[in-house]
Amino acid sequence: MKVTVVSRSGREVLKAPLDLPDSATVADLQEAFHKRAKKFYPSRQRLTLPVTPGSKDKPVVLNSKKSLKEYCDGNNNSLTVVFKDLGAQVSYRTLFFFEYLGPLLIYPVFYYFPVYKFLGYGEDCVIHPVQTYAMYYWCFHYFKRILETFFVHRFSHATSPIGNVFRNCAYYWSFGAYIAYYVNHPLYTPVSDLQMKIGFGFGLVCQVANFYCHILLKNLRDPSGAGGYQIPRGFLFNIVTCANYTTEIYQWLGFNIATQTIAGYVFLAVAALIMTNWALGKHSRLRKIFDGKDGKPKYPRRWVILPPFL
């Protein structure tokens, strides 16, 4: 089988077509392409079928696990594919590890080290119990996130553009420093013991619930990474489409009830907006896929992310 690789403008990317056996898969094509163009390793390649000029149809993305024959017309023994360079890639585990490592290391710096001394405050600073519990709560959360990244999460995509590492790290690391600065500040005014206990108690329950939601989501995904959508079921997923986001938002609400800083609530608002946008997209996608037609189950009526509001 001869495979011609062209750019989106129609220009041939390789000087000559690739010669592959008839039994070759898309993954074999990607490896052969990589051997001819060393720069473009498989996770950097996006291969699609050509689209007729003027057509509004979306290009069909080639599945790496499928045979190339499945994309050929009839008995045709040649194929043209369109190549797009996705840019330098990094694994999702690497991305998540670094974005979570920052807050895990930055927050204790403001608690344990004399940061405020260099900002003009005296050496004798009273550390309130809520500040100690907040540090433990914060570190537990991000340590849990890192463990989930390596031992729980299954990713539908193997890699992410390397630029996302800098963007995500800027988001998590800057908010980590912003919140840590105010919660551990020498002039920080603690809330009442009752409010602190309610906040941290509620937050810890949500952290445990969040972990269980991730276990349920893991069990929905094929270990081989084959992808595909399923209706999430069990526990909070019986009433909320994105229960993992729900518990994530509410666990930060618990943290902010206990610590009560503007910085913390700004982070909560931004995170809630981002996750709500993701949840609306996922809810809409699941309802579209599971429409009750052609033998498919109908997606049940559920809250999207924030019962009883949305």
UniProtKB/Swiss-Prot annotation:
The chain crosses the membrane at residues 95-115, 126-143, 164-183, 197-217, 235-255, 261-281. Expressed in roots, leaves, stems, flowers and siliques. Detected in mature seeds. It holds the Pfam family Steroid_dh. Catalyzes the last of the four reactions of the long-chain fatty acids elongation cycle. This endoplasmic reticulum-bound enzymatic process, allows the addition of 2 carbons to the chain of long- and very long-chain fatty acids (VLCFAs) per cycle. This enzyme reduces the trans-2,3-enoyl-CoA fatty acid intermediate to an acyl-CoA that can be further elongated by entering a new cycle of elongation. Thereby, it participates in the production of VLCFAs of different chain lengths that are involved in multiple biological processes as precursors of membrane lipids and lipid mediators. Part of the fatty acid elongase complex which contains a beta-ketoacyl-CoA synthase (KCS), a beta-ketoacyl-CoA reductase (KCR), a beta-hydroxyacyl-CoA dehydratase (HCD) and an enoyl-CoA reductase (ECR). Belongs to the steroid 5-alpha reductase family. This is Very-long-chain enoyl-CoA reductase. It comes from Arabidopsis thaliana. The lineage of its organism: Eukaryota, Viridiplantae, Streptophyta, Embryophyta, Tracheophyta. The gene is ECR.
